[in-house]
Amino acid sequence: MLFADVVGFTKVTEDLTPVFVEKFLGGISEMIKKLSRAPAFVNTWGDSFFAVFDDLDDALNLSMQLRDYFSGDTWSELGLDDGLEVRISMHAGPVYEEFDPVLGRRNFFGHHVNQAARIEPIVLPGSVFVSEIMAALLSFGHDDFDFEYVGNLELAKNYGSHPIYILQRTGYKDSI
C-alpha cells in the first residue's frame, strides 16, 4: 500500500486549485499508465493519494516516480517559490477488500491500511518511508532499491512506535 500527501498544499491559493489538481492527479494518472499493472485500487481526496498494489515492483516504481515528480520545477506556475514536496509511506500486510456503501464501490480496510496511513504524516518531506515489513520484502530480489533504518518512530495518532526505513533507488544518497 502507498499513501502520499502534499506538504504545503494549504499555500496553494483557491484560484490555482484547478492547476494543482491537473498537475497532481494528472501527473499520478500518467505515472500509473506507465506501470506494468495498474494498482488494484486507488483513491484520492484533496492533496492525498492512496493505492493498493498486487505487484511490489509497480508500487516501488510509482513511489520513486512520485517523489521525483515533486522535486522538479512542475509547481512554479502555482506561485510557490519554494515549491511543494510530497510525503510517501508504504506498508504491506493482509487487508479486507469490502464493498463500501457510501462510495458505491469496493474499498480496502483493516489494521495494515491504518498502519500505512499512520506512517505518512511522520515522513520527512520529499522522502519515502517504509515499514519493516516493506523493508523485509525489499531484501529479496529488488536490487534497484535500497533502504536505510531511520529509527523506531512514533506513528501519527498514537499508533505506537514502529521500526521505519527510508526508501531510495540503489546508489541514491539523501540526508536523513
Name each region found by the language model.
Residues 1-65, 69:
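Catalytic NTP-binding/metal-coordinating core of nucleotidyl cyclase/transferase enzymes
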Residues 9, 59, 95, 134-135:
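A generic structural signal for short hydrophobic patches within well-formed alpha-helices
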Residues 12, 52, 98-99, 137-138, ...:
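Residues that scaffold the ATP/ADP-binding catalytic core of kinase and kinase-like folds
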Residues 34, 121-122, 140:
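Solvent-exposed polar/charged
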Residues 117:
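Active-site phosphate/pyrophosphate- and oxyanion-stabilizing loops and adjacent acidic/basic residues
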Residues 125-176:
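Intrinsically disordered, glycine/charged-rich C-terminal tails and inter-domain linkers
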